[in-house]
């Protein structure tokens, strides 16, 4: 197996499919009202913003969103980024892969997924110009029609359409239809009816729980315990307990907060019902991420006057005189310099940001110290380049039985404006199978080692073997060794196979109690603000939507501190079904009396 390259929010489409099963629980109380799209923020600059300088520390989705909102309001913004703009969301080139005037093969930390439950990020996308698109980058979103739970051990796969008006069913051959029905029937046989009924009851308990019960009880209850997985069948555990946690948010079902998992599931139920959605439950970009989104965003921000310092590493946020007095950063040559501004927005991932907070800064706001309790884990991508397109599902696939919790999507068919072999690589690769690895601490099937214990080459071979075990196990060969051109593993992962592997791009996870350690965007330090997917916002998940919403909240806090007359950023909350409010009010009354939810039978 040829490796390419040097010595990846995540997939939530499993929840979109799961929402189809859960829709029955929500349909009785859901309304068909849809929330209006978030309005674009006003671009009029604040009279007091002229000459006010803001240093944005980090150039991922959070940092670029903050820069966007601030620049529209007349602030002089400089973004400091250590590696490349876009952060974990960016796509990248495979070094040395271009031939004959083509572009390098496209790679990424992990494939992008922008579901209809997002509102703030799509609003920003609409405000980024893209040639020929009346709605800017937002028009580059496309919606796969189906997804699949790929089963191993000779089990037929579960292939499901993604419900949305205008979606037509995939054209299935008689054999594909037989296999799809076989997968459903095999699951029905193994998943007892009473267990399905119990799970739907638990869904109803969560949907009708008041906010207080969610925040104070379900936040401290592991999902595994909430759905009583230990008392259920292996099929129940695999699909309903583990399948919609580990493969979605890189969080173990035994530890994941019920509030987080339930909130995500609830959002997808109503998205599938067409309530309060920006679009279909599953959306992806119609080009590699930088081509479709990040590069146009950078160009637009530069047109607004934003300056970028690429290759600058933030070392320490200094504190003095009751304010942030400056930021020590290393320039591309390694020389330490002190950056000064009127305001500072920390938009680094939490595991990097908290290392930069000086002792004085932490003492000024104890909230920063609580961020040390936030946990991260590995979720990283690998891409396989194929010389023949594999006959896979036309959307995301979730290898639900795989040891390393693999999710994947074959990308070329979703990039209609690109002839893959004509545009990328050496002309022989025709597609990219992009895979996210969510489990790095369990033994694989090929070497009996964890992903962290494997070398880069062993990781690639192991992932390929696990994919084949899930896809080639029912008498068909969907992935062929002869069609494998090369592979590329996220360069943010280093030291694999050594005692001390590292990952520069870990993902925030959500064990019980996480909610209460999330900080607010505004701090007690008058010129210091936080932006990132770890900041407390309405969507309780490490997502690009959370990063975007937190940046808007940070900018609003900054505008308040400046007594600015500029319009505040719109921060659109998750959809709340009006039909559920009466049940939630009743549950609030019961909760305050110390009673269970009325649907909670234990």
Task: For the regions a language model picked out, list residue spans one by one.
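Conserved beta-strand-loop-beta-strand element in the redox core of flavoprotein oxidoreductases
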Residues: 318-338
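Dinucleotide-binding Rossmann-like beta1-alpha1 core, especially the glycine-rich loop
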Residues: 99-198
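N-terminal Rossmann-like FAD-binding beta1-loop-alpha1 element of flavoenzymes
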Residues: 52-78
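Active-site-proximal substrate-binding core of FAD-dependent oxidoreductases
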Residues: 559-601
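C-terminal segments that line or cap access tunnels to active or ligand-binding sites in enzymes
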Residues: 274-285, 328, 341-343, 348-518, ...
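Active-site/ligand-binding neighborhood in enzyme catalytic cores
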Residues: 195-323
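N-terminal secretory signal peptides and thylakoid transit peptides that target proteins
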Residues: 1-19
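Glycine-rich FAD pyrophosphate-binding loop
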Residues: 71-95
């Amino acid at each position: 197996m040829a490796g390419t390259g040097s010595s990846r929010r995540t997939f939530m489409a499993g929840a979109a499919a799961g929402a189809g099963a859960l829709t029955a629980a929500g349909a009785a109380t859901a309304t068909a009202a849809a929330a209006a799209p978030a309005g674009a923020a006003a671009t009029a600059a604040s009279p007091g913003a002229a000459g006010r300088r803001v240093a944005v520390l980090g150039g991922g989705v959070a940092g670029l969103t903050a820069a966007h909102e601030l620049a529209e309001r007349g602030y002089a913004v400089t973004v400091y980024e250590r590696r490349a703009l876009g952060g974990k969301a960016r796509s990248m080139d495979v070094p040395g892969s271009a031939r004959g005037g083509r572009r390098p093969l496209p790679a990424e930390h992990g494939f992008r997924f922008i579901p209809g439950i997002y509102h703030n990020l799509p609003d920003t996308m609409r405000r980024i110009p893209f040639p020929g698109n009346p709605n800017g980058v937002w028009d580059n979103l496309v919606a796969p029609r189906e997804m699949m739970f790929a089963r191993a051990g000779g089990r037929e796969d579960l292939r499901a359409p993604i419900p949305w008006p205008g979606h037509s069913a995939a054209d299935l051959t008689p054999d594909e239809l037989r296999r799809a029905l076989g997968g459903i029937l095999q699951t029905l046989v193994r998943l007892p009816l009473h267990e399905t009924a119990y799970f739907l009851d638990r869904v109803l308990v969560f949907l009708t729980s008041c906010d207080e019960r969610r925040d104070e009880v379900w936040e401290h209850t592991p999902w595994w315990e909430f759905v009583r997985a230990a008392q259920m069948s292996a099929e129940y555990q695999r699909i309903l307990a583990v399948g919609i946690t580990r493969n979605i948010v890189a969080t173990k079902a035994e530890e994941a907060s019920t509030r987080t998992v339930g909130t995500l599931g609830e959002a997808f139920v109503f998205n599938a019902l067409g309530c309060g959605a920006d679009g279909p439950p599953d959306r992806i970009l119609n080009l590699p991420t930088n081509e479709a989104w990040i590069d146009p965003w950078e160009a637009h921000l530069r047109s607004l006057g934003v300056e970028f310092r690429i290759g600058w590493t933030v070392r320490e946020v200094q504190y003095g005189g009751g304010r942030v007095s400056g930021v020590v950063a290393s320039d591309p040559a390694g020389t330490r310099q002190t950056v000064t501004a009127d305001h500072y927005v920390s938009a680094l991932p939490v595991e990097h940001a908290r290392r930069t907070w000086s002792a004085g800064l932490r003492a000024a706001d104890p909230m920063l110290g609580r961020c040390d309790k936030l946990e991260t884990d590995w979720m990283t991508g690998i891409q396989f380049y194929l010389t023949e397109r594999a006959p896979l599902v036309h959307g995301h696939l979730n290898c639900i039985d795989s040891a390393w919790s693999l999710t994947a999507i074959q990308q070329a068919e979703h990039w209609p404006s690109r002839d893959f072999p004509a545009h990328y690589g050496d002309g022989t690769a025709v597609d990219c199978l992009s895979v996210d690895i969510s489990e790095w601490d369990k033994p694989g099937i090929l070497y009996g080692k964890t992903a962290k214990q494997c070398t880069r080459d062993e990781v690639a071979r192991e992932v390929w073997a696990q994919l084949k075990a899930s896809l080639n196990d029912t008498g068909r060969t969907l992935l062929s060794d002869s069609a494998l051109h090369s592979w590329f593993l996220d360069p943010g992962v280093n030291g694999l196979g050594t005692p001390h592997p590292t990952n520069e791009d870990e993902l925030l996870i959500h064990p019980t109690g996480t909610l209460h350690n999330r900080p607010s965007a505004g701090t007690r330090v008058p010129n210091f603000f936080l932006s990132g997917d770890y900041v407390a916002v309405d969507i309780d998940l490490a997502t690009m939507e959370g990063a975007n919403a937190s940046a808007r909240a940070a900018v609003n806090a900054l505008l308040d501190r400046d007594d600015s007359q500029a319009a505040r950023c719109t921060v659109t909350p998750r959809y709340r079904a009006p039909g559920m409010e009466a049940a939630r009010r009743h549950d609030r009354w019961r909760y305050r009396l110390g009673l269970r939810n009325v649907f909670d039978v234990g």
